[in-house]
From Swiss-Prot:
Pfam families: Ribosomal_L9_C, Ribosomal_L9_N. Belongs to the bacterial ribosomal protein bL9 family. One of its GO terms (biological process) is translation. It comes from Nitratidesulfovibrio vulgaris (strain ATCC 29579 / DSM 644 / CCUG 34227 / NCIMB 8303 / VKM B-1760 / Hildenborough) (Desulfovibrio vulgaris). GO terms for cellular component: ribonucleoprotein complex; ribosome. InterPro entries: Ribosomal_bL9, Ribosomal_bL9/RNase_H1_N, Ribosomal_bL9_bac/chp, Ribosomal_bL9_C, Ribosomal_bL9_C_sf, Ribosomal_bL9_N, Ribosomal_bL9_N_sf. This is Large ribosomal subunit protein bL9. It comes from the Bacteria. Binds to the 23S rRNA.
Length: 167
């Protein structure tokens, strides 16, 4: 089955490519999701008229992703986690936890865009890639720290502020 792609599809092709796919993939995924259309002569002509609109939309998405990547680049994200003996984490740091941490910083990123080779299971610093668009990737540094140390720092910081206010 020949399909004209109406958007970039990972591991398949880019906007405007005519690709051959298995009929089930085309009928059950590409066509219903609006990612492609059947490659007939009439659809090829209609697509050429629609191509500029789709390309403008894709460029706008790429530019928005580049703006978010500029905010993310060089960001150090501290993730407080409960630890047991020998600094072993209870559980692990997953993409959902990293996504929540970024949301707390005011940067909304879908957890599926965060690329982890495997879950983080120990304290330390880990470089994590965030794929915002097919062409735009940013790298952040995730620093996994003990929850106890974060609480100690949080308790000592407010204690110092009232003294400064009293002076």
């Amino acid at each position: 089955m020949k399909i004209i792609l109406r958007a970039d599809v990972e591991n398949l092709g880019r906007l405007g490519d005519v690709v051959t796919v298995k009929p089930g993939f085309g009928r059950n995924y590409l066509l219903p999701q609006g990612l492609g259309m059947l490659a007939s002569q009439a659809n090829l002509k209609a697509f050429e008229l629609e191509r500029k609109k789709l390309q403008a939309r894709m460029d706008a998405l790429r530019n928005a992703a580049a703006d978010i990547a500029a905010k993310l680049e060089g960001l150090v994200l501290a993730i407080p986690m409960r630890v047991g003996e020998n600094d072993k984490l209870y559980g692990s740091v997953t993409t959902a936890i990293i996504g929540d941490g970024l949301a707390a910083q005011g940067i909304e990123v879908d957890r599926r865009r965060i690329l982890l080779d495997s879950a983080i299971r120990a304290l330390g610093e880990y470089p994590v890639r965030v794929r915002l668009h097919a062409d735009v990737t940013a790298e952040i540094l995730v620093k996994v720290v003990s929850e106890d140390k974060v609480n100690d720092v949080a308790e000592s910081a407010p204690a110092e502020e009232p003294e400064a206010a009293a002076e």
